[in-house]
Curated annotation (Swiss-Prot):
This is Chaperonin GroEL 1. It comes from Burkholderia ambifaria (strain ATCC BAA-244 / DSM 16087 / CCUG 44356 / LMG 19182 / AMMD) (Burkholderia cepacia (strain AMMD)). It catalyses: ATP + H2O + a folded polypeptide = ADP + phosphate + an unfolded polypeptide. ATP binds at residues 30-33, 51, 87-91, 415, 479-481, 495. Gene3D superfamilies: GroEL, GroEL-like equatorial domain, TCP-1-like chaperonin intermediate domain. GO terms for biological process: protein refolding. Residues 526-546 are annotated as: Disordered. Residues 534-546 have a biased composition (Gly residues). Its EC number is 5.6.1.7. Keywords: ATP-binding, Chaperone, Cytoplasm, Isomerase, Nucleotide-binding. It is an enzyme of class 5 (isomerase). GO terms for cellular component: cytoplasm. Signal peptide: none annotated. InterPro entries: Chaperonin_Cpn60_CS, Cpn60/GroEL, Cpn60/GroEL/TCP-1, GroEL-like_apical_dom_sf, GROEL-like_equatorial_sf, TCP-1-like_intermed_sf.
Length: 546
């Protein structure tokens, strides 16, 4: 085990605070509509230019071990806020730096760090309650577009695209972000349920122009095992042929004579069928088959439920208005499932989302909810260069998270104004002793900091603007983009309540930990081993004259 360096008290804290300041100073220049760019070196390819706080924070690793510890703790604030609310990373970093900076002054003057932390926690709890009170619901397309635009660094086209996507697929719908092929942003909407499995044979295609198989008013047969013997399928195929309607078969796999017979029947026009593999793997496959069954009003033919292919009837088959099967995707439009059953299934999957432990599982479950609830929208990001594409894509993803947060918990006035207004709830607070009161003062001061930084980045005098905004009421604030004092909500400068709340809570949490740190343990830097001695010189000339 490598030797460790153990540092105590002020020496440990001051080194860690240096790291906090290095990271925060690099991140906070990006805050606000007039935030500056930060250039990030890449190990291959050109550098990345960004105004995204969390992207800057993620790149920072410091050489000094203790400084790096402090920087990593604040990096945690940024990434936690980004994970929970999708935005507010720079605000959280600015708040954390301010709480640490002010707190260190009090700790240095001999105050009890634990009481300071109690005061900080008390003030933050009161501020969060006040933020919830002044929050207003975000329901209209215009408000959603405003939130998206602000989060995407005042890019209105991104906000408009997100609002349009939410309008098409609903607030719960899945919206994904992909690289576009042109310079302009595009929006593609897939209605109904789509899953990533296509036809098993190109001979099923009946629309050569689009290279898809289209089935109008089809039956849907769902089976959780492989089908290779056509005899298993014959009874149900005969019933479907009598009904004179097409059939989509979704099974674990369809191969051998079963697939060959379906293809021959299709070519001869005896029975219009398409076979596709079931989506997903393992337990997720079972769940997705069940989703399709509920959406189409059918049942999964599975031995567990006592159903077999030979005994299947039309009653067990699902139905839909239209199904399109391409090379890689299958889309079921307007399934015949009952609305109440679909709603119950959506509730069940939402409950699983709450309990999911991994981000991957949560994402897959959210996709299932959206497919059941009504559709998927894809925003294709357009840009002239790859560097611009990466930067813009990151902004679109941030804006998307922020708009979801706004729909969830509502919106407050942006530009740091909501935090200034929430200070009113703290002003009258008192702690159990002078040290706790100092903790409350620390938070009061920190809540001005985001507005100060926005104004500073815009090249104006921060103290004057903060005093003017604090003297105002309600949504009155400073619009840094235009340099005017306006009603922030009317001007469209709004933040999701969840973003502001999460930023404040996470910043206070990590800053409190730093202030109450009394020892730090880090690996000692390794000393480079001396270079081995060189080889002795080569033999000289032999002195032989030829």
């Amino acid at each position: 085990m490598a030797a460790k360096d153990v540092v105590f008290g002020d020496s440990a804290r001051s080194k860690m605070v240096e790291g906090v300041n290095i990271l925060a100073n690099a991140v906070k220049v990006t805050l606000g509509p007039k935030g500056r760019n930060v250039v990030l070196e890449r190990s291959f390819g050109g550098p990345t230019v960004t105004k995204d706080g969390v992207s800057v924070a993620k790149e920072i690793e410091l050489k000094d071990k203790l400084q790096n510890m402090g920087a990593q703790m604040v990096k945690e604030v940024a990434s936690k806020t980004s994970d929970n609310a999708g935005d507010g990373t720079t605000t959280a970093t600015v708040l954390a730096q301010s709480i640490v900076r002010e707190g260190m002054k009090y700790v240095a003057s001999g105050m009890n760090p634990m009481d300071l932390k109690r005061g900080i926690d008390k003030a933050v709890a009161a501020a969060v309650e006040e933020l919830k009170k002044i929050s207003k619901p975000c329901t209209t397309n215009k408000e959603i577009a405003q939130v998206g635009s602000i989060s995407a660094n005042s890019d209105t086209s991104i906000g408009d695209r997100i609002a349009e996507a939410m309008d098409k697929v609903g607030k719960e719908g899945v919206i994904t972000v992909e690289d576009g092929k042109s310079l302009a942003d595009e929006l593609d909407v897939v209605e109904g349920m789509q899953f990533d499995r296509g036809y098993l044979s190109p001979y099923f295609i009946n629309n050569p122009e689009k290279q898809v198989a289209v089935l109008d008013n089809p039956f849907v047969l769902l089976h959780d095992k492989k089908v290779s013997n056509i005899r298993d399928l014959l009874p149900v195929l005969e019933q479907v042929a009598k009904a004179g309607r097409p059939l989509l078969i979704i099974a674990e796999d369809i191969e051998g004579e079963a697939l060959a017979t379906l293809v021959v029947n299709n070519i001869r026009g005896i029975l219009k069928t398409v076979a596709v593999k079931a989506p997903g793997f393992g337990d997720r496959r079972k769940a997705m088959l069940e989703d399709i069954a509920i959406l189409t009003g059918g049942q999964v033919i599975a031995e567990e439920t006592g159903l077999t292919l030979e005994k299947a009837t039309l009653a067990e088959l699902g139905q839909a208005k239209r199904i399109e099967v391409g090379k890689e995707n299958t889309t079921i439009i307007d399934g015949a499932g009952e609305a109440a059953s679909i709603e119950a299934r959506v509730k069940q999957v939402r409950a699983q989302i709450e309990e999911a432990t991994s981000d991957y599982d949560r994402e897959k479950l959210q996709e299932r909810v959206a497919k059941l609830a009504g559709g998927v929208a894809v925003i294709k990001v357009g840009a002239a260069t790859e560097v611009e594409m990466k930067e813009k894509k990151a902004r679109v993803e941030d804006a998307l998270h922020a708009t979801r947060a706004a729909v969830e918990e509502g919106i407050v006035a942006g530009g740091g104004v909501a935090l200034i207004r929430a200070r009113t709830a703290i002003a009258s607070l008192t702690g159990a002793n002078a040290d706790q009161n100092a903790g409350i003062k620390i938070v009061l001061r920190a809540m001005e900091e985001p507005l100060r930084q926005i104004v500073t980045n815009g090249g104006e005098e921060a103290s004057v603007v903060v005093a003017a905004v604090a003297a105002g009421q309600g949504n009155y604030g400073y619009n840094a983009a235009t340099g005017e004092y306006v009603d922030m909500v009317e001007a469209g400068v709004v933040d999701p309540t969840k973003v502001t709340r999460t930023a404040l809570q996470n910043a206070a949490s990590v800053a409190g930990l730093l202030l109450t740190t009394d020892a730090a343990v880090a690996e000692l830097p390794k000393e480079d081993a001396p270079m081995p001695g060189g080889m002795p010189g080569g033999m000289g000339g032999m002195g032989m004259d030829m």
